[in-house]
Structures are given as structure tokens and as C-alpha cells.
Amino acid sequence: DLTDRIFCDALPQMVKDKMGSLDIVINNAGIITRGPLPEASDKDITLSMAVNIEAPLRLCRASIPIMAGQGGGIIVNTSSCWGLRPGPNHPIYVMTKAALASLTQCLGRDHAHQNIRVNAVCPNEVDTAMLRSGFEARGLDPLKAIDDLNASVPLGRIADPQDITDVITFLASDAARYMCGSLVEVNGGKPVI
């Protein structure tokens, strides 16, 4: 439960204790809140902030001293293209993903000297259960909505989860050894408009 502060604060040390080291942290959890800000409930705001900002912040805060003590490590955050260029009617989501992108750049700069590389993947639309349930919640047919999105992407389709996983795997590998504080867009050629 990433809304549990005590859990988030303790998780990196629990992993190190169990595995012997903490080499890679992938902050991939996220939720999306849709709609204009005046319609957002306090619950929506609190949950979005807890999952999209506070959990990765706490996990990074607890992981960095462990990684520094063992000579380095890698953190990959999942932000969003929307965190770099806001889209319409998602102000809470956009704000939280922009905060995570900014945190990534700050930590990348601040901890590079400790051999800790912090980067973020910034996907556009990805064919996930979260995307499909969002369409359903708005009364849309998910298959038709995804077909419409596919037509808007220069590469002809939205991302599937493997497209994002491949970039995360790259960022967590030695092939990305000179990347630190980078925000890598994975958008099929479709910028947020």
C-alpha cells in the first residue's frame, strides 16, 4: 500500500535486508484523476498526491542512503509526457507527473556524484487496464476509444506495456550509464497537444 508512509519508508531497507543489496528501484505506481479541477474531490487530490508524488519521494529518500552506502544504484521513475507538456482536463494528474519529472531531475543532479543514476520514463497513452477503465468510466467503448487513439499516433498505435518496459530496462542497464536526470519520452511520435 503506497499510501502507507511507514511502509514506503521501510521498504527499501526491507529489500536490502532480504536481497543483500538495493541496486535498482522502479517507481511505477500511478493513478490518474480526470476532469476539471473544480470537480476534483479532496479524496481525489489526496490519493493522487500520495501515490504519484509522496510514495516515490519517500521511496527515493529511503533508497538513496542505502545506494550511496553500497557505491551506487539506479532509480527509474515513471512520469508522463503529460508531466512535460500538460494536456486538457487532467490538472491533478499533470501536476503530480510534472512534480515527479522535476524530482527526477533534481535527484539526478544531486546524487550523480554518489554513482546513483536517477532517470524517468515519460510515456504517452499506454494500453493498460487503467486506460481502459478510464474510458469505461466515461461511458466510452474502450476498443473504439483505443482505435481512435491509435489513429492519432504517427507510429499507428498507442504503446503497449512492453514498449515502456523496454525503456525502463534500458534505463536500469549499464547501456544508460551516462544518463542521469534524463526524462525519456515514449510517445510513438505523438506529443501531448
Predicted features, each with a name:
Residues 37-38, 85-91, 113-114, 156, ...:
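Active-site loop immediately N-terminal to the catalytic Tyr-X3-Lys motif
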Residues 60, 96:
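Active-site helix of classical SDR
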Residues 80:
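Residue(s) in the substrate-gating loop at a strand-loop-helix junction
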